[in-house]
Amino acid sequence: MGIDRNLAYLLHAATRQHLPPSRPAVTLGVQARHGGPDPFAAMGLGAVESIDVSDFEGCTHLLDLNVAELPPELRGRYSLVYDGGTLEHVFDTRAALRNIFGLLCTDGVVAHASPVNGWVEHGFYQFSPTFFVDYYQANGWSPLGAFLLHLRGGGRATVHHYVSGMWDALPAGAISGLWLSLMVFRKVPGARWDVIPQQSFYRRIHEDASAPPIAAGLAYAPPFDLVDGVVAAEDRVVRRLPRPSPGVGYEWHAHLPQLEGVADTTEGRLSPLLLFEDGRPLGPPHAAHQAIRATGHGLYSHWGAWLHFSTSDNAPPGERVYTYSLPRAL
């Protein structure tokens, strides 16, 4: 897969506040760079080495990530492990994660760029983002960034900031096309590799249904488009939200009958509406109505002729100003 300009932009955005130590970096497989400046050099890292199961592409070190033990000379050697589409080809995922842990020094960073959807027969697996977030959270790593990229072609990708639970309510088929994830985590002191996580979706159901969906240190932000590593300007119209009425629990309703044609549906259509409270984005959108009512804290859903939403602090809207934006082309 390698690293293109969009992935390089997001990797820089994720690590700029917590740069890895100045040591060698390693890529899993020989990773081509598809244009743009070298993201590893921009982070001030040392030499970039590579690991692969064969020397067909001229890797630095021969290693099968399925193996039980790392060579002593590779343990703790690297400040960054970049997985640019290798993990899905390794049958023993747990062994590979253990070896990634072993390759990294303390405060080192792992970055996984992995297929999420649309890559049938590309590898053994397509990883949902919850796999990485739940695993690294359970093992005490610090999250630096979690992004979902919907690839549009021509160097364009729509980027979604991922937080746990944000798409629990999406119907089957809502995610179509080619999607990648970029998941970036730091191996802080005390981090582990061997804790087996329980999927957070079921933890929310069985342990604490009211737990906030923003977990693991990740925060929601509205989606945006990247074109060859540059944020694309989007022409959107901003309108004042009609006066809302109270619903159940933390839920509020606003009537938007003129927008019913772009609302979320059970067939998988996702509304492009973005909601703001005093100019600050709320979200995540497309939330389950029960989560809006029981959890709140900015969750919302544009469904049918109504916007179902919660305020950022679960207090009544009061004098706060609520606006929404839509692409001007609609």
Cite the ranges covered by each PLM segment.
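Short, P/G- and charge-enriched loop/turn segments at secondary-structure junctions
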Residues: G36-P39, M166-G173, G261-V262, A294-H297
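Basic, amphipathic N-terminal segments that precede the first structured/catalytic domain
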Residues: G2, V26-G29, Q290
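Class I SAM-dependent methyltransferase Rossmann-like catalytic core
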Residues: M1-R23
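Conserved SAM-binding loop
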Residues: A25-E121
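Extracellular polysaccharide-degrading/modifying enzymes targeting complex plant/algal/animal polysaccharides
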Residues: A221-L330
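A glycine-biased structural micro-motif
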Residues: P21-S22, G76, F309
